[in-house]
């Protein structure tokens, strides 16, 4: 219907940018986006808990690192369904969350490197902890004044 309105009003598809055309062609209904958000988010939680359970098995560090990272990636992908991938990427790299985004993405990569290539269990566990903390800090950036509240709580506890 929107395309018909654009054609009737004199706006051609040629006037739209390529990105807008691709996003228009691949847009999902709100119900579909909500369903996929829930599916990805639940899968992310499942993979994270599965990875945590595998940590206690003999030689389970590799599986822990892989599944925990996969869980975080699925949780991150879930928000792409709510706001769209382009908008999500733009928000991720805004100045308010740029540092948290970079640290989070580096920790995802370093967790896998430490577990799979470097074979350093302690380092993989450290990167998983940093991954959790950076993902939490990144998520708090979407809630107004949440970071300030956390900083005030931590500073009052420490001194």
Swiss-Prot record:
Q: Which residues cross the membrane?
A: 37-57, 63-83, 98-118, 123-143
Which residues are on the Cytoplasmic side of the membrane? Answer: 1-36, 84-97, 144-159
Q: Which cysteines are joined by disulfide bonds?
A: none
The UniProt keyword set, sorted, is:
Membrane, Phosphoprotein, Protein transport, Transmembrane, Transmembrane helix, Transport
Sorted alphabetically, which InterPro entries does this protein's record hold? Answer: Vesicle_transpt_Got1/SFT2 (IPR007305), Vesicle_transpt_SFT2 (IPR011691)
UniProt keyword Transmembrane helix present: yes
Q: Which residues carry this modification: Phosphoserine?
A: 9
Query: By its UniProt entry, which Pfam families does this protein fall under?
Result: Got1
Q: Does the keyword Transmembrane helix apply?
A: yes
BP GO annotations: protein transport; vesicle-mediated transport
Places the protein is found:
Membrane
- Would you tell me the Gene Ontology cellular component terms? cytoplasm; endomembrane system; intracellular membrane-bounded organelle; membrane
Q: How does it sit in the membrane?
A: Multi-pass membrane protein
Ranges in the topological domain labelled Lumenal: 58-62, 119-122
The record, for PANTHER family, names: VESICLE TRANSPORT PROTEIN SFT2A, VESICLE TRANSPORT PROTEIN-RELATED
Q: Which family does this protein fall into?
A: Belongs to the SFT2 family.
The role this protein plays is: May be involved in fusion of retrograde transport vesicles derived from an endocytic compartment with the Golgi complex.
Q: What is this protein called?
A: Vesicle transport protein SFT2A
């Amino acid at each position: 219907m929107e395309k018909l309105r654009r054609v009737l009003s004199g706006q051609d598809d040629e006037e739209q940018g390529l990105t807008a055309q691709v996003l228009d062609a691949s847009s999902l209904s709100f119900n579909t986006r909500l369903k996929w958000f829930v599916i990805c988010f639940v899968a992310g939680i499942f993979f994270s808990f599965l990875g945590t359970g595998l940590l206690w098995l003999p030689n389970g560090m590799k599986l822990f690192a892989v599944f925990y990272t996969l869980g975080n990636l699925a949780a991150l992908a879930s928000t792409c369904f709510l706001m769209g991938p382009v908008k999500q990427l733009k928000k991720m790299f805004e100045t308010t969350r740029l540092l948290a985004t970079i640290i989070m993405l580096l920790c995802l990569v370093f967790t896998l490197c430490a577990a799979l290539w470097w074979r350093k269990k302690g380092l993989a566990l450290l990167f998983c902890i940093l991954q959790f903390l950076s993902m939490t800090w990144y998520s708090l950036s979407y809630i107004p004044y949440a970071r300030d509240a956390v900083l005030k709580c931590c500073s009052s506890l420490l001194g």
